[in-house]
Amino acid sequence: MILGDFGTSYSKFLDLSAARPEPYIIPSKTLTVENRVTIATGHIGKRFSDRYVNELTVLARGGEQLITENDFVLLDCGSRDIKFIHYIDGRLNDMGWNSECGASMGFTIELLARYYDLDYHVLPVPDRPFSVTCGVLGMSRIFDDVVSGTPDAEAVARFVMGIAINAYRFAGSPTKLYLSGGLCDNPLFVQSFPCQVVPLGRFVLLEGLKAIARKDNNPQDSKALS
């Protein structure tokens, strides 16, 4: 059984039939018909499986597997959108999905690093952010500031911080936030949140799919979707 999280920029897979299942990643632009899976989620997942599960459902199941607290907020930041789930007393309390304020967020952050030849591992957190409503529209603010004399690195750092604060507010401004997605590997983004952040990595949705597959195989397994 192969599970797939099909994102806009990257797709993640887990082959449960392998002797030692390990997740792996490939660029979504290289996907072919050979990449069909048993259960899929993600923006383009319906094209690669007969069984598709909504991303919010999978995110919730992944959070249940990886987070021990009964009360938590889990935010997933992807290439083209952001989504969150909020649990209270071990039960789903709220959720949200936004492709407007999160439009092309992860993609834009990655694109800027390439364009300006920047390393987010060494960029310091700026003293103030840009007011950013979405990734695409925020780029014009960067170019305006660079033309006005702001160093490239500082302008991009303010943009990244603005994106992080916007995502934080979308998730309800929690005091502690669990983070999912490729931006977990971006220290500038993680450190720009005005709260405690616990990065869970980019395979949370695969964990959710694995829990769903386990439940399918053993409906009596209460731990699968507890």
Describe every region a protein language model picked out:
Residues S49-G90, Y168, E207-N217:
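Conserved phosphate-binding catalytic cores of ATP/NTP-utilizing and phosphoryl-transfer enzymes
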Residues R91-C134, G201, E207-I212:
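Glycine-rich phosphate-binding loop plus the immediately following alpha-helix
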Residues C134-K176, V198:
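Adenine-nucleotide phosphate-binding core of ATP-dependent small-molecule kinases
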Residues M1-R61, Q191:
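N-terminal glycine/serine-rich phosphate-binding loop of ATP-dependent small-molecule kinases
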Residues H43-I44, R169-F193, L200:
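Glycine-rich phosphate-binding loops at beta-strand->alpha-helix junctions
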Residues R61-E64, G106-I109, V197-S226:
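Glycine-rich phosphate-binding/hydrolytic loop that grips phosphoryl groups
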Residues M1-D5, N70-D76, Y178:
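Short glycine-aspartate micro-motif
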